[in-house]
Amino acid sequence: VYTDNPLLNKIIRSFRDWGRDCVCPSGHDNMCGHRFDRQYGELPLGYDHKYVYSHFGYNLKATDLQAAIGCAQIEKFPTFVERRRHNFDRLRAALAETEDRLILPVPAENSRPSWFGFLITCKKGTDRNKLVQYIESKGIQTRMLFAGNLIKHPCFDEMRAEKKGYRVVGTLENTDRIMSDTFWVGVYPGMTDEKIDYMAKVIKEGLLQ
């Protein structure tokens, strides 16, 4: 798709990437300087703009290219998995003392995951937005658990106002909890023990702020 219209360019890119509102290119965060200080739809004030959805979009990526890269790396797969598990276990152990303030991830029974990331949920009395911004200020990237409660995003504004086009079953209390209190940090296999230890130290410092 080619266009010389900046607005169409933004909309096209949003549709390509799940309908996200953020226009920061991959690898660059908070280029607008307002990642954590605005309110969208019915989301909480300060919800991470990288995970605000203003359109009903698609996951349109170069999947053939991604598959080719995956095939080229398949021999490294066991090493990647073991390192992710190692990083997860090290971070989990380092943060064990914070379980009065945070809900830390545990594997499901009879499972041995290759961890995508390290999911943290703040308990009552711990401000996720404040904690995440402190962690980010120390050079550690964080991410939301995607949309949380999707119907509170701007993409639902019109349907919410008209009260039609979708239905809700139950209270959605868990999606609301995720939306308000949950975030990721990484366990990328290229991370060293020193980086994992630094991340744990910063998270614990953030809880004291």
Model regions and ranges:
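Glycine-rich phosphate-binding loop of ATP-grasp-fold ATP-dependent ligases
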Residues: 1
